[in-house]
Amino acid sequence: MLPSQSPAIFTVSRLNQTVRLLLEHEMGQVWISGEISNFTQPASGHWYFTLKDDTAQVRCAMFRNSNRRVTFRPQHGQQVLVRANITLYEPRGDYQIIVESMQPAGEGLLQQKYEQLKAKLQAEGLFDQQYKKPLPSPAHCVGVITSKTGAALHDILHVLKRRDPSLPVIIYPTAVQGDDAPGQIVRAIELANQRNECDVLIVGRGGGSLEDLWSFNDERVARAIFASRIPVVSAVGHETDVTIADFVADLRAPTPSAAAEVVSRNQQELLRQVQSTRQRLEMAMDYYLANRTRRFTQIHHRLQQQHPQLRLARQQTMLERLQKRMSFALENQLKRTGQQQQRLTQRLNQQNPQPKIHRAQTRIQQLEYRLAETLRVQLSATRERFGNAVTHLEAVSPLSTLARGYSVTTATDGNVLKKVKQVKAGEMLTTRLEDGWIESEVKNIQPVKKSRKKVH
């Protein structure tokens, strides 16, 4: 017999329709993040794929009128963020989501924005080489736009001080990370151009992730660098970090330290150049003066050739030359005679046995001293080792232990007693003290119970 109120009976079609309406009205639109897999695009232009995480997955569809607004091509394994409606495909009863919009998740989104801005500015010509301003050579004042507490500023100042200590540096402190950083960087560039104190600017910061460097991928910063009348050197992150600012700047340096190298003069190299130029100038002056002097001498000599006293002067010169040669020959003869006498004296002194005897005596004294010193050192070391051995032997000797008040007791069988259970009442014991032996009889045995501490 059927109950008075029978339960509602669904057809399969009605069940699927009811579930679809519940999902669409109760859930509405939701944001979902996940990894794309099984991506396909049939001839209809619609996208079909699966979103998954570590433990679950869901089928997705994105129709052509929606996916045409997506600015990138989804790839297998890509992390994305989608806005979608939850629904049920009634003919098969399959639960799925209909995606309305899609964007890369995390750094993928930033990379997508980076590529879009790069393409936009490149199309406008902001990267063209024709707009690059040459750097001053040499720079008379350097402006630095970066964080006043960052490592980049320290590196820049260290390099500038080492290479060109006299080069003035003006710091325009600004935030280089966070939401306020792009605006502060733009204002610092504009302020440097208004004050017009320096003839080159370094704009940069130390290394970091894509999010950390994102201020230098801001469109406002790129346009401010492009509009700067002062040449700008970008120095953002490490050599592998490339930002929009690097493309717009007049010159890109791989690191802040490299930027400081580019804008500064090496004073040591300049000093070497000055010294080299000075040497070349001195050599040129010496050559010129020598040439003029030689020319003057030639003219003077030609005039002297016509003088009536020339023959007399020549004869006088010849006489003086002969006198010098005679004096020189006499001095050489006396010198050779003296040297020969000195050599003979040295040979005679070398045959004298007294120096050899003296050297031998000195050598014997040195050997006797070294022998005595060696014996003394060895004897001292032997005594020290002997003393150490005696001390060690006394320390480990049982007699020294007995001397401190201890004793050794043995049973009749000669075994050393360690526990009371080794003896019985009435047995005879032998006790060894420092100065003798004691024999005793066991009257009473009383064990001592060991107390155990409780651990709380």
From Swiss-Prot:
MF terms (GO), sorted A to Z: exodeoxyribonuclease VII activity; nucleic acid binding
Subcellular location: Cytoplasm
GO cellular component annotations of the record: cytoplasm; exodeoxyribonuclease VII complex
Disulfide bonds: none
Alphabetized UniProt keyword annotations: Cytoplasm, Exonuclease, Hydrolase, Nuclease
Protein name: Exodeoxyribonuclease 7 large subunit
Membrane-spanning intervals of the chain: none
Record organism: Shigella boydii serotype 18 (strain CDC 3083-94 / BS512)
PANTHER family, per the entry: EXODEOXYRIBONUCLEASE 7 LARGE SUBUNIT
Gene name per UniProt: xseA
EC number: 3.1.11.6
Catalytic reactions of this protein: Exonucleolytic cleavage in either 5'- to 3'- or 3'- to 5'-direction to yield nucleoside 5'-phosphates
UniProt xrefs under HAMAP family: Exonuc_7_L
Assembly description: Heterooligomer composed of large and small subunits.
Biological process, per Gene Ontology: DNA catabolic process
Chain's role: Bidirectionally degrades single-stranded DNA into large acid-insoluble oligonucleotides, which are then degraded further into small acid-soluble oligonucleotides.
Top-level enzyme category: hydrolase
